[in-house]
Regions:
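Short N-terminal secondary-structure initiator segments
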Residues: 18, 53-54
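Post-cleavage N-terminal segment of exported redox proteins
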Residues: 1-48, 102, 132-150
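Extracytoplasmic electron-transfer domains, predominantly the class I c-type cytochrome c fold
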Residues: 48, 55, 69, 73, ...
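Local sequence-structure signature of Cys/Sec-based thiol-disulfide redox active-site neighborhoods
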Residues: 54-60
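Short cysteine clusters
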Residues: 62-65
Length: 150
């Protein structure tokens, strides 16, 4: 057995290793795509209200202050679990009423506290935002973000 690696052997190791890791990369990419499409996000529950709520979320730049699944600014509370924190999983109408009241009461005017601006959303827009937050709360995020307090 040769004590040195020949050019042919080195080339074979390079091509074999490259092919192996390329196959691993393709496999992991396909698995991630499959997981996202079939498990993580349930497209069957997407409604027009959810889509309009997402549009309201983006139009008003909510992510500039809030986080959603850990993404966004950390100025205001995490909102991916606000629907559950407000009891929407047990009593959706009370959670909707709470969201309507919260949005109508902003800014709260409490001195020294961070203030959420008044966006003057219509009742339909608040309902659509509630649909979006309800949909987000049902995404399977593998317990991310770790801070559930909001």
């Amino acid at each position: 057995m040769a004590e040195r690696l020949t050019k042919t052997a080195a080339r074979n190791v390079f091509y074999g290793g490259s092919a192996f890791f390329f196959a691993i990369f393709v496999g992991l990419t396909a698995h991630s795509h499959y997981y996202i499409r079939t498990v993580s996000t349930d497209e069957t529950t997407l409604t027009e209200g959810v889509a309009r709520g997402k549009h309201i979320w983006e139009k008003n730049s909510c992510i500039n202050c809030h986080t959603l699944d850990g993404e966004g600014a950390y100025f205001a509370p995490e909102l991916s679990n606000v629907w559950i924190r407000w009891g929407g999983d047990k009593d959706p109408s009370s959670a909707r009423d709470a969201l309507h009241a919260w949005m109508a009461a902003q800014p709260s005017g409490i001195e020294g506290r961070r203030q959420m601006p008044q966006f003057n959303l219509t009742d339909q827009e608040v309902d659509d935002l509630a649909d979006f937050l309800q949909w987000v709360s049902k995404m399977k995020t593998q317990n991310w973000p770790p801070n559930q307090a909001g």
